[in-house]
């Protein structure tokens, strides 16, 4: 079905499919947008009045993008920050749903921030750090620089990317 610019567009498409009685296409629409096929069934059965709320549509888009990118580790935490912002702010949900806003670009901004703000890890920490190398536990060797943004910076970068703040 392609990319939707808003939850309203998504719900209008769902409304058309419901009016045609096309439950199978409605289920496909739901799954393509990170929702469950059961959400489509609930919509057709009249249990809910729309296929997706603003939060469901935004979280669904992020879920689909996250899966495609194989998001894991610290980037999973960064992704979760977007969902948390959506839960707190309907305008943020709308911004996430916009065409041209993508999780990969937000992640790229966080990685750029991480690189630009890296700091050396203390030698005191490194000399007691063990790492697996070739299947063997060894002392960490060499300098290490980290620049992982704190939670406040992650939120700030998310708001700047998605909302332009």
PLM feature segments, named:
Residues 57-116, 120:
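Charged, amphipathic alpha-helical linker/scaffold segments
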Residues 37, 106, 133-134:
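Short amphipathic alpha-helical patches
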Residues 1-4, 92, 115, 140:
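Phenylalanine-focused residue identity feature
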Residues 43, 102, 106, 113, ...:
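Sequence-level detector for tyrosine residue identity
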Residues 1-79, 163-165:
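Low-complexity, interaction-prone regions
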Residues 47-57, 80-83, 124-135:
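Short, compositionally biased low-complexity segments
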Residues 117-165:
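Long, highly charged low-complexity segments enriched in Glu/Asp and Lys/Arg with interspersed Ser/Thr
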């Amino acid at each position: 079905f392609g990319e939707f610019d808003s939850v309203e567009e998504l719900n209008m498409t769902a409304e058309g499919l419901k009016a045609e009685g096309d439950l199978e296409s409605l289920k496909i629409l739901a799954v393509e947008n990170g929702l469950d096929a059961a959400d489509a069934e609930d919509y057709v059965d009249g249990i809910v009045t729309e296929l997706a709320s603003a939060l469901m549509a935004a979280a669904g888009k992020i879920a689909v993008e996250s899966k495609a990118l194989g998001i894991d580790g610290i980037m999973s935490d960064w992704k979760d920050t977007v969902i948390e912002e959506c839960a707190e702010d309907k305008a943020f949900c709308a911004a996430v749903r916009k065409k041209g806003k993508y999780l990969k670009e937000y992640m790229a901004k966080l990685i750029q921030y991480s690189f630009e703000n890296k700091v050396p890890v203390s030698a005191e920490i490194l000399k007691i750090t063990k790492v697996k190398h070739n299947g063997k536990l060894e002392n960490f060797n060499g300098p290490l620089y980290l620049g992982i943004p704190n939670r406040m910076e992650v939120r700030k970068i998310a708001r700047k990317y998605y909302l332009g703040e």
